[in-house]
Amino acid sequence: MSIKSDRWIRRAAEGGMIEPFEAGQVRTVNGGRIVSYGTSSYGYDVRCADEFKIFTNINSTIVDPKNFDEGSFVDFKGDVCIIPPNSFALARTVEYFRIPRSVLTICLGKSTYARCGIIVNVTPLEPEWEGHVTLEFSNTTPLPAKIYAGEGCAQMLFLESDEVCETSYRDRGGKYQGQRGVTLPRT
């Protein structure tokens, strides 16, 4: 497997791999500095949309991935999301992805957030998966933490195999195929 360059990412985006797509790095908006997004040398920095689900323990329930209680989240829409101390929030990317059959995509958090104790977690985007990426932001600090909608939050790295997989995510009818919006756990 080899990592794909900015040139490859731009060509793949022309075919609809990333929508909307930014061909370069955006670092300012209306003269103000932002957490960057867009194409980098060997990756694509995604933006966080303005839809959030903030985890709360008001129901004092057990967190069970096989039987997740949607009441454990408070829905929020806005330009800035405040994550409570030692808690987390779910969000989604602005971008919609269509991953090629020969490609596996790995997501890593941006250092701007990591250096503040905010960790971004996303599982790999498998071959032929498509949808908005659900992002998990963990606030590891004892203080409230800010997430900015419309700005960069994580980087996607595209790895292309020298051999096409026998069975893709679409082939096996993956449960998150075509997801739109913030998607909660499914079994």
Swiss-Prot record:
Keywords: Hydrolase, Nucleotide metabolism, Nucleotide-binding. One of its GO terms (biological process) is dUTP biosynthetic process. This is dCTP deaminase. The keyword Protein biosynthesis does not apply. InterPro entries: dCTP_deaminase, dUTPase-like_sf, dUTPase_trimeric. It holds the Pfam family DCD. Catalyzes the deamination of dCTP to dUTP. It comes from Bordetella avium (strain 197N). PANTHER family: DCTP DEAMINASE.
